[in-house]
Amino acid sequence: MKLMKLNRSNILIIIVSIFALWNLSWFLITSIKYHKFVEVVPKNEFGVHLLKKDDGYIYSIKKPGYLSFTGNLAISNDDDQESLIIWPLITGGYEYGFSIQKDRETYEFYVDDDDNMKPIDENDPAAIEKMEEYKLELEELLSKAKEMWQL
């Protein structure tokens, strides 16, 4: 009976230790990964990492939620019709998404490693048309993001 109690307490200690280690790992990984980003986009008076620069671009950061490793960086123009979302990957590198809001419609695209847009819905002719129309805006947002966050 005493051996059974000892085993239960050992199991509980192991479980608590694993959970504590997971929390510590999450905290260190996300803090280190996002440190260089939040340094250049500090929290505003509302506690949000948001910065509007004089050039009309708005930069924001969403750090990963508790025990999640997925956060994002975002940049949009002043009229907020075009936005670039950047997902820093834990393993290194980034994934990009581009969003256009025009005439009450939203068009979303993946951005590949060569900075080319690919519509999420490849069968949507309007999205393909917008993709061609907004190439310069994507290039400008990518350039601003790379300059701001040293990507």
What are these regions (language model features)?
Residues 9-18:
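Hydrophobic H-region at the start of alpha-helical membrane spans
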